Amino acid sequence: MDRSGLVTGVKQGTCQISKKDMTYQVDVRHLEQRENGTYVDGILIVNKSYPLSADYDPGLQPETKAAFQELCDAAAAEGMDIYDGSDYRDYSYQVKIYHNYCSLYGWEKADTFSARPGYSEHQSGLTIDCNTIDDAFGETQEAAWLAEHCADYGFIIRFPKGKEAITGYKYEPWHIRYVGADVAKEIQKYGLTLEEYLGVDSVYAEPWQ
């Protein structure tokens, strides 16, 4: 258990943790390393601790695309204009994006809002940036609708406000990740990040070289 209370298991099963006079029952999740990346209980995790292979090139996943279309249709029915501003990016494209930000802001600042090559969720084909990549989007009715309803279509707000120390990235109200409706609703219900739900961290092993 770390200082924030995050518990990481080393094998599948359950464990019991006691703190002072309080006892908690904790599920231990199953972490599996596959050829393209790391899965926790069957969910692909991509963050600063868990990269994808450079040659992983799935494009936008069909299930993600279909679910997003349903989301957009539902939003439109309520007078909202939500659209795909950016989705899949391959490794080489992320190299260009990250290096450009590093040249403009330095790698320490870039790391707060841009993923290093191989560490971007966009390469998974499970992530979509809605509308415009602009902090002002967070003040729109579309952003409010997205935060309230995206879980119904299997998406989560991947980098929520106030969770920067956990996700490793600044708040991005436009950035949604497909995890399936059951998981998304549970994450939304308890106000979790994907890291908290899966019991993993998001920290680069070393400074950018």
Residue ranges and their predicted role:
Residues 1-31:
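Extracytoplasmic soluble-region selector
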